[in-house]
UniProtKB/Swiss-Prot annotation:
Its main location: mitochondrion. Keywords: GTP-binding, Ligase, Magnesium, Metal-binding, Mitochondrion, Nucleotide-binding, Tricarboxylic acid cycle. It is found in: Mitochondrion. GTP-specific succinyl-CoA synthetase functions in the citric acid cycle (TCA), coupling the hydrolysis of succinyl-CoA to the synthesis of GTP and thus represents the only step of substrate-level phosphorylation in the TCA. The beta subunit provides nucleotide specificity of the enzyme and binds the substrate succinate, while the binding sites for coenzyme A and phosphate are found in the alpha subunit. PROSITE patterns: ATP_GRASP (PS50975), SUCCINYL_COA_LIG_3 (PS01217). The keyword Zinc does not apply. Residues 35-263 form the ATP-grasp domain. This is Succinate--CoA ligase [GDP-forming] subunit beta, mitochondrial. The record marks E67, D136 as: Important for substrate specificity. Substrate binds at N297, G354, I355, M356. It catalyses: GTP + succinate + CoA = succinyl-CoA + GDP + phosphate.
């Protein structure tokens, strides 16, 4: 699991997020896609092949040497300990020695839904499997480069405790987490990579190799507009090589206009279709597991809304930020997305009108309710610019809309709707 996913799991101390399924304005790649990118920048990886049909596994295996590792390709961690819904087959990562074994393993995985600690209970459908040459690591280390607001730019993070849950290392032995902030203008300095290589236990020629790998990973990070390049394990092998065995690379969506080749690798089948649809209309949507649908303007207000719903005994079904200048069409599309979720039994709209005027939102709510044929309770709290006009529009709409005086009142009314 990534050291940097934890912030996506808790909001206000009460809501747990699923990092594999929730939109965080980053593009995620499959492991084989990340390896392809690393190969381009001179980063040492195992030789690998990817297959989408089990019948191709024997040929792919023949192009590789020695023992093979067969890995299901999904955007989720914990694959090795996962299981497949359809057959109960255990593990999305296996070792094998022959092409025939690889074919059997691919047949067990392809087209099946893999459930891990980072997926929903429905799992994620495996549509590709990577075969790679197995590496015998002498030491498994950890290395990452991430954008960190605390440092105002990229920072290298390393630990001699790799190949395991790095979050546990950070919690239990924080003294084994080493950081080196990078000046975004001057770039990475040799003394920084030398310092980290030494702290990771590299000496002599191996230290120079490790330093070069860190430099190559930084070039990948900076030239491809990555927000995170995480290598776990960053391994020293028994034959003296330094290999990046597993990688997680994220990219800022804002860089899509100049990283077209990378963004063409996006696998929307791995994403919540509601999130994909919301993105088309500039809506920031994250699906959760509750039954109170939320539509709010502003990320902070949206999180506060979810927290208060939870505190009042309800469970939010989503995070949905319509932004500061959403159109009536965007509001309508937001309603369509929310009402497509069969778990949603009540909608709560919480708008603080600044740039976005309350009368515009009110008109959008009325039109959206009519278009989708809304049949579930709707609670609306409006405040700010043109609030009185907005409330009047709602009152004259003839729709079954419950107005709330403030956020606390709105949360209570939404929760009470579910008790009727």
């Amino acid at each position: 699991m990534s050291l940097f996913n934890s912030a996506n799991k808790v909001i206000g101390g009460v809501l747990k997020f699923n990092p594999s399924k929730y939109q965080v304005r980053y593009l995620n790649l499959h492991e084989y896609q990340s390896k392809s990118l690393m190969d381009k920048y001179g980063v040492n990886t195992q030789k690998w092949r990817v297959v989408t049909k089990a019948s191709d596994a024997i040929k792919a295996a023949s192009e590789l040497n020695g023992e093979l590792v067969v890995k299901a390709q999904v955007h989720a961690g914990g694959r090795g300990k996962g299981s497949f819904i359809e057959t109960g087959f255990k593990g999305g990562v296996h070792l094998c020695k022959t092409g025939k074994e690889a074919e059997r393993l691919c047949d067990e995985m392809l087209g099946k839904h893999l459930v891990t600690k980072q997926t929903t209970k429905e799992g994620t459908k495996v549509q590709s499997v990577m075969l790679a040459e197995s590496v015998d690591p002498k030491r498994e280390l950890y290395f990452a480069i991430v954008m960190d607001r605390k440092y105002g730019g990229p920072v290298m993070i390393a630990s001699p405790q790799g190949g395991v849950d790095i979050e546990s290392v950070a919690e239990e032995t924080p003294d084994l987490i080493f950081k080196e902030p990078i000046d975004i203008v001057k770039g990475i300095r040799p003394e920084q990579t030398k310092n980290l290589a030494e702290k990771l236990g590299f000496t002599g020629e191996k230290a120079k190799i490790a330093q070069q790998q860190m430099e190559n990973l930084y070039q990948l990070f900076i030239k491809s507009d990555a927000t995170q390049v995480e290598i776990n394990p960053f391994a020293e092998t028994t034959d003296g090589q330094v290999i990046c065995m597993d990688a997680k690379i994220n990219f800022d969506d804002n860089a899509s206009f100049r990283q077209k080749e990378i963004f063409e690798m996006r696998d929307t089948a791995e994403e919540d279709p509601r999130e994909v649809e919301a993105g088309k209309f500039g809506l920031n949507y994250i699906g959760l597991d509750g039954n109170i649908g939320c539509m709010v303007n502003g990320a902070g207000l949206a999180m506060a809304t979810m927290d208060i719903i939870k505190l009042k005994g309800g469970i939010p079904a989503n995070f949905l930020d319509v932004g500061g200048s959403a159109s009536e069409q965007a509001v309508t599309e937001a309603f369509k997305i929310l009402t497509k979720d069969p778990r949603v039994k009540c909608l709560l709209v919480n708008i603080f009108g600044g740039i976005m005027k309350c009368d515009i939102i009110a008109s959008g709510i009325v039109n959206a309710s009519k278009q989708v044929g809304l049949k579930i309770p709707l609670v609306v709290r409006l405040e700010g610019t043109n609030v009185n006009i907005g409330k009047e529009i709602l009152e004259k709409s003839g729709l079954n809309i419950t107005s709330a005086s403030d956020l606390d009142d709105a949360a209570i009314k939404a929760v009470n709707c579910l008790k009727k």
